[in-house]
Curated annotation (Swiss-Prot):
Homodimer. Heterotetramer of two MnmE and two MnmG subunits. Keywords: Cytoplasm, FAD, Flavoprotein, NAD, tRNA processing. PANTHER family: GLUCOSE INHIBITED DIVISION PROTEIN A (PTHR11806), PROTEIN MTO1 HOMOLOG, MITOCHONDRIAL (PTHR11806:SF0). It is found in: Cytoplasm. GO terms for molecular function: flavin adenine dinucleotide binding. InterPro entries: FAD/NAD-bd_sf, GIDA_C_N, MnmG, MnmG-rel, MnmG-rel_CS, MnmG_C, MnmG_C_subdom, MnmG_C_subdom_sf. It comes from Geobacillus thermodenitrificans (strain NG80-2). FAD binds at G14, A15, G16, H17, A18, G19, V126, S181, Q370. This is tRNA uridine 5-carboxymethylaminomethyl modification enzyme MnmG.
Length: 629
């Protein structure tokens, strides 16, 4: 029986990593928000690796936190291990990664949602959207409830027509044997959305008590206190190690002999898999010359014996998976607790979205997370917070928010999706960001906290602390520009010990800090500050002074880009009326409908000549409008 379930400002479908951020952002902004999810016990569930962060992804978590999101705070409360990666490299590629206690992570996130003002949680299955005259007005659940809203966000992950595949067995399912969402997928097609079939996979889990850890290498966490969130002040000290082992030639032989049983090679899997997270059979085939591959053994939590066998993602039959485990040092007698599997699911072609993550086809409808063709919890959460902000702003009549490629990795991610699309599950990499020196782990707050505060997601107390930090950085930079360090014997000794060449004359402290071998600690010894300098202030001062030339160069490029971003393209432009455009360019421009010349220039198939023609056309139109006025 159909009935009226209630009216809201925003409805979020799904409470995975995208849905949680979308719902919390919306509610915190002040929109009356409803989250409908298939299973309230699976909020923020980690169906694949029990970790948050890593290269590029860790920076996204920092950005979510700088905007006022939850993922960073939640992992800081629940990790079992944390490490800073790439510490031997430059600041642009450093990133934090934490192993999660996945059950605790879920529990804490559920608690946060339950206690959030303006937020209602509901277990249910959305099967249809209420769409009138191309505008989304709400949702209809399996039980016939009609819920109305001014904006709807779909964050259904890998549940849309999900199918699990192990060997020659294939059955309808969401991740981890949860119920899939079939009717909503069919309904999206009815509305005219183009869907694609993607695939992802997960490795087996084994019982920790049956692993011989003496045959593996220990991988401890960092002793230095670390956190994703700028608000975290308490650090977990009793960390659990991970362990490293390797596949063997015997592992590879078994895979080679049984490739015909792999659904990837038998033709059973039609969906495109993630390039940067290949299955073990894929690795063995593609890198046949490699005698071994790394396998990390990652505990899934403090209260469980389940261990995630990272690097052994597979959809081979279960009996073959058991044979593979027996060939890996340390896992010879490991008990299989859950078999690895592949999952195929529907995703929306993301060029059907505006940069706000609103769909072009249906107004007031937003999508975020794996439904948009991405892979990874962090990518999902980054889209979730932006979709939640924009949905709430639409409902409350506020301006839309779009992060540019020079603002954040989240901006790079969304721009790549809506401008270029993706023909495989999209993973964020540092190499995708042309301004990666500006988009660092250490400066996410300096880039985004101002915006988070303006939107209403950052508290006054946190904002004041942020302003104090900013002022302290500027004060110390100014001091180092004026203080002169003279070539005294003590100074020469410090420089010699650091591996540098001695001073001939006095030098400004900032210029000495620019030398590769010198650190801020050295400068503090030679020219101590009058005030206590917090470690995060010292870090910023050192990076900003050391890399000043490169940063300035990047900022000049950003200014050039902004000029192109400011050249707006009307939404209702008729590309068929523009003479001289190449056929491919015309087709791509009509499909993507870019909002600026900068976005148009990033579409594959649109050449500089096409951009010139487009610029002339827009200029002629502007002149015509001015003369008519």
């Amino acid at each position: 029986m159909e009935y009226h379930g209630g009216s809201y400002d925003v409805i979020v479908i799904g409470a995975g990593h995208a849905g949680c951020e979308a719902a919390l952002a919306s509610a915190r902004i002040g929109a009356k928000t409803l989250v409908i999810t298939l299973n309230l016990d699976m909020i923020a569930f980690m169906p694949c690796n029990p970790s948050i962060g890593g290269p590029a992804k860790g920076i996204v978590v920092r950005e979510i936190d700088a905007l006022g999101g939850e993922m960073g705070k939640n992992i800081d409360k629940t990790y079992i291990q944390i490490r800073m990666l790439n510490t031997g490299k430059g600041p642009a590629v450093r990133a934090l990664r934490a192993q999660a206690d996945k059950v605790l992570y879920q529990r804490e996130m559920k608690k946060t949602l339950e206690n959030q003002k303006n937020l209602t949680l509901l277990q249910g299955k959305v099967e249809r959207l209420i769409v009138e005259d191309g505008v989304c007005k709400g949702v209809i659940t399996q039980t016939g409830a009609h819920y109305y809203a001014k904006a709807v966000v779909i964050t259904t992950g890998t549940f849309l027509r999900g199918e699990i595949i192990i060997g020659d067995i294939k059955y309808s399912s969401g991740p981890n044997n949860q119920q899939p969402s079939i009717k909503l997928s069919e309904h999206l097609e009815e509305l005219g959305f183009e869907l694609v079939r993607f695939k992802t996979g997960t490795p087996p889990r084994v019982n920790s008590r049956t692993i011989d850890y003496s045959k593996t290498e220990i991988q401890p966490g960092d002793e230095e206190p670390r956190a994703f969130s700028y608000e975290t002040t308490k650090y977990i000290t009793d960390q659990l190690p991970c362990w490293l082992t390797y596949t063997t030639e015997e592992t590879h032989r078994i895979i080679d002999e049984n490739l015909h049983l792999s659904p990837m090679y038998s033709g059973m899997i039609k969906g495109t898999g993630p390039r940067y997270c290949p299955s073990i059979e894929d690795k063995v085939v593609r890198f046949h010359d490699k005698p071994r591959h790394q396998i990390f053994l990652e505990p899934e939590g403090r209260e469980t014996e389940e261990v995630y066998v990272q690097g052994l993602s597979t959809s081979l039959p279960e009996h073959i998976q058991r044979k593979l485990l027996e060939t890996i040092p340390g896992l010879e007698k490991a008990q299989l607790m859950r078999a690895g599997y592949a999952i195929e699911y529907d995703a929306i072609v993301p060029t059907q979205l505006w940069p706000t993550l609103e769909t072009k086809l249906v107004k007031n409808l937003y999508t975020a997370g794996q439904i948009n063709g991405t892979s990874g919890y962090e990518e999902a959460a980054g889209q979730g917070i932006m979709a939640g902000i924009n949905a709430a702003h639409r409902a409350l009549g506020r301006e839309e928010i779009i992060l540019s490629r020079s603002d954040a990795y989240i901006g790079v991610l969304i721009d790549d999706l809506v401008t270029k699309g993706t023909n495989e599950p999209y993973r964020l990499l540092t190499s995708r960001a042309e301004y990666r020196l500006l988009l660092r782990h250490d400066n996410a707050d300096l880039r985004l906290t101002e915006l988070g505060y303006r939107i209403g997601l950052i508290s006054e107390e946190r904002y004041q602390a942020f302003l104090a930090k900013k002022e302290a950085i500027e004060r110390e930079k100014k001091r180092l520009q004026t203080v002169i360090i003279k070539p005294t014997p003590e100074v020469q000794e410090v420089i010699r010990q650091a591996g540098g060449s001695e001073l001939k004359d006095g030098i400004r402290a900032a210029d000495l800090l620019r030398r590769p071998e010198m650190t801020y600690e050295h400068i503090q010894k030679l020219a101590p500050a009058d005030e206590d300098i917090a470690p995060e202030v010292a870090e910023q001062v050192e990076i900003q002074i050391k890399y000043e030339g490169y940063i300035q160069k990047s900022l000049q490029e950003v200014e050039r880009l902004k000029k192109m971003e400011n050249k707006k393209i009307p939404e209702d432009i008729d590309y068929d009326a523009i003479q001289g455009l190449a056929t491919e360019a015309r087709q791509k421009l009509k499909q993507v409908r870019p909002l600026s010349i900068a976005q148009a220039s990033r579409i594959s198939g649109v050449n500089p000549a096409d951009i010139s023609i487009l610029l002339v056309y827009l200029e002629q139109g502007r002149i015509a409008r001015v003369s008519n006025e």
